[in-house]
A protein has these predicted regions:
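Peripheral, non-transmembrane regulatory/ligand-interaction domains of membrane transport proteins
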Residues: 4-235, 241, 245, 249-259, ...
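Hydrophobic alpha-helical transmembrane segments and their immediately adjacent juxtamembrane loops
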Residues: 75, 248-350
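A generic secondary-structure micro-motif detector
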Residues: 56-57, 236, 286, 325
Length: 350
């Protein structure tokens, strides 16, 4: 036995190489073996690797020591481990000699953003890496605890399907919220368009574009997986049927996203048209007012009309100046109040 590691023996591990476990250190995650979840430690992981027992190691982020454990003890390729350390990766499948590395994206139910999951598919197990809580994985943990696995495929392929399927399904409730939000905005715009609505529309459009960027490569990725272009260890024809189901879901999601993007463009056009029509109405009313006062101003200016009441009642330069400026200021304030009440400046119409 290795000095300093009394709990572990050398052996041929999950990658077909000699496993030399390091110190029994607690990892930030959960180890699932035979439906039972326990706190993940390097010693426990090394044990299941040596015995080739099907397992699932679910990690909440990779610190430097955990990354070193995956690379040196489990002997995963350093390029894949480095990718798993840094989030912001595009969806992809990388095939290595002893394992397959996935980057899969889902949706965050509380917002219109996307989440990212890194998956290592090994001959006898699965390792997942994510940041923070992942509700999709919580559902998978619950299913495994109830022993709801797919019986006609290998345990690791079954687990991979459950994880990816649960992650992809998170898009549907988020897209349903998109639909409701777009309908609300369209009703609000037809009732009263505002600048704030335009900002919300652009935010939604950016979210859809971000979602489209992860959906399209994932659709192509699982198309290759379902058709057998990419071959996974222990993958059977029955397993490919399950991944074709994921591919079908991704096609539906991509079509929905494209439809919502077109719908948002139509709502933006509606906003612009509504604002333009409203501006035309305002200009029409102002033109009528100006047309009424134009001949009156011409006549009073042509004949030099003045108010005789001012003669003898307002004397001196300062009182006359104060009266004139005060009357002008009062006129401006009345007009501003009238325009605001009509919603022509500074707010909605009444």
């Amino acid at each position: 036995m290795e000095a300093g590691c009394p709990h572990h023996a050398f052996g041929t591990g999950i990658l077909g190489r000699s496993i030399v476990p390091d110190q029994n250190r607690i990892m930030k995650g959960t180890l699932v073996v035979d439906g039972t979840s326990t706190e993940a430690t390097t010693g426990a992981v090394a044990d299941v690797v040596v015995t080739s027992v099907p397992f699932w190691l679910d990690l909440d982020g990779l610190d430097e020591e955990s990354a070193r454990f995956l690379a040196e003890t489990l002997q995963l390729h350093r390029l894949a481990v480095e990718d798993a350390e840094h989030f912001g990766q595009r969806p992809k499948i990388d095939e290595f000699d002893d394992f397959t590395y996935f980057v899969v994206h889902g949706a965050i139910p509380e917002s219109f953003a996307t989440s990212e999951l890194h998956i290592f598919l090994l001959p006898h197990g699965v390792i997942t890496v994510h940041h923070g809580d992942c509700p999709a994985l919580a559902d998978v943990h619950a299913r495994i605890a109830r022993r709801h696995l797919i019986e006609d495929v290998s345990p690791q392929v079954s687990l991979l399907y459950l994880i990816v399927d649960s992650l992809i399904d998170t898009f549907f409730p988020v897209l349903s919220r998109f639909d409701d939000r777009i309908d609300e905005l369209e009703d609000d715009i037809l009732r009263q368009p505002t600048e704030a609505q335009l900002g919300v529309l652009f935010d939604l459009k950016r979210s859809l574009i971000a979602m489209r960027k992860v959906i399209t490569p994932q659709r192509d990725m699982f198309a290759a997986l379902a058709s057998g272009v990419v071959e996974l260890p222990s993958m059977t024809a029955e397993g490919q049927r399950y991944f074709r189901d994921i591919y079908d879901h991704l096609i539906r999601i991509a079509d929905i996203v494209d439809g919502y993007r077109d719908l948002l463009s139509g709502v933006m056009d509606t906003h612009v048209s509504t604002v333009s029509n409203r501006l035309n109405v305002v200009m029409k009313q102002l033109t009528i007012i100006a047309t009424i006062f134009l001949p009156l101003s011409y006549l009073t200016g042509f004949f030099g009309q003045n108010f005789t009441f001012l003669i003898g009642h307002v004397t001196g330069r300062l009182p006359f100046l104060a009266f004139g400026l005060g009357l002008e200021l009062a006129t401006v304030l009345v007009l501003v109040y009238f325009f605001r009440r009509r919603g022509w400046i500074g707010g909605p119409t009444t």
